[in-house]
A protein has these predicted regions:
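Short, small-residue-biased leader/transition segments that mark boundaries at the very start
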Residues: 1-8, 304
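Radical SAM enzyme core and accessory elements
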Residues: 9, 15, 286-302
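Short, structured beta-strand/loop micro-motifs enriched in basic residues and often containing a Trp
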Residues: 13-21, 41-44
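Terminal peptide-recognition signature
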Residues: 25, 33, 61, 105
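Conserved PDZ fold ligand-binding element
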Residues: 27-45
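PDZ-domain C-terminal substructure recognizer with occasional recognition of PDZ-binding tails
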Residues: 51-87
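Conserved Radical SAM active-site core
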Residues: 70, 77-223, 233-262
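Flexible glycine/acidic-rich beta-alpha junction loops that bind and position SAM and/or redox cofactors
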Residues: 204, 224-250, 270-294
Length: 304
């Protein structure tokens, strides 16, 4: 351990909130309130950078202590071992908000008077990797794609809604939403594992439109390893919002037959069921839920 005076122009600082007992950080006498300045003389843009730079057997950390001293710490560790700290901001950067105005958005349908954080609409690929959030790709830049492919951050969970570009623009109320589908090609070619989701809206992206979407999405299997289909959720707080209808039993049974037909195709072709109807469809149809083996290990579930 060496004290070091160092000036990095425009360096990003990351405040350490907690040090885990028995961790590398505790052994190095890193404490809550210390600040991580760099790893291997590289500034850390966000949690992607942090994880990528920490994946090595030898790393050099620059830490600023609470008293203002800067410590340069040379660490020898197992390749996959983490430092063992929690940062004040888990993303180590600002959260990216959603640029869409989806006709089915559940946040727009929430009652007033709840805590402020519940009304924040995120659409951040980093949260997709870290927490399983679904992203629309509309605010994902080429730089973001390059980093995801470079760091091989998998899986990325994508909200497709439809593979019809014009319809996707309408559903997301974003004129770039159709063009954003081209980013799926880059993720696929970069061998980035994906899961997909379709929020089904009656008379909009169901039936024939869904058939078209599943046909297009099946071309990305098995890199795209699952597509979950969920019915749009409608609340009583819909004043001024796009008029949407609830599905009925007949709709649910049609959807399930459509899904099961595609499952047979995909099992034969790739050995996975690929497309999954959420529990709501089976309950609405009056059917028993499928056996566990049909879910391919529950790839579509969000694990936090």
């Amino acid at each position: 351990r060496r004290q070091r005076q160092m000036c990095i122009r425009d360096r990003v600082e990351h405040l350490i909130k907690e040090v885990y007992p028995g961790s590398i950080a505790e052994e190095l006498e890193i404490e809550p309130g210390d600040v991580l300045l760099s790893i291997n003389d590289q500034s850390i843009e966000d949690v992607f950078d942090y994880r990528y730079l920490m994946n090595d057997e030898f790393v050099t950390l620059l830490i600023r202590k609470k008293n203002g001293e800067e410590w340069e710490l040379e660490v020898e560790k197992e390749y996959e071992d983490d430092l063992g700290v929690e940062f004040e901001n888990s993303l180590m950067d600002e959260y990216r908000s959603c640029s869409n105005h989806c006709i089915f958005c559940f946040i727009d349908q929430m009652p007033p008077g709840m805590r402020e954080t519940l009304y924040f609409k995120d659409d951040d690929s980093r949260l997709s990797f870290l927490q399983g959030n679904y992203v629309t790709l509309t605010n994902m830049s080429d730089y973001d794609l390059d980093r995801i492919i470079k760091f091989h951050l998998s899986p990325i969970n994508v909200s497709f809604q439809t593979m019809n570009p014009k319809l996707r623009c309408k559903m997301l109320h974003n004129r770039f939403a159709g063009d954003a589908l081209a980013k799926v090609d880059r993720l696929y070619k970069g061998d980035v594992t994906m899961n997909g989701q379709i929020v089904l809206c009656k008379g909009i992206n169901d039936r024939d439109e869904l058939e078209y979407s599943l046909e297009k999405l099946s071309e990305y299997a098995p890199v795209l390893q699952s597509v979950s289909i969920v019915p749009v959720g409608l609340s009583r707080y819909r004043k001024g919002l796009y008029p949407l209808e609830s599905f009925d039993k007949e709709d649910a049974r049609y959807l399930i037959s459509q899904v099961e037909r595609w499952q047979k195709i995909m099992v034969k072709k790739h050995g996975i069921h690929f497309v999954h109807a959420s529990d709501e469809w089976y309950i609405l149809a009056g059917y028993e839920l499928p056996e566990e083996g049909r879910y391919d290990g529950y790839l579509s579930l969000i694990h936090i």
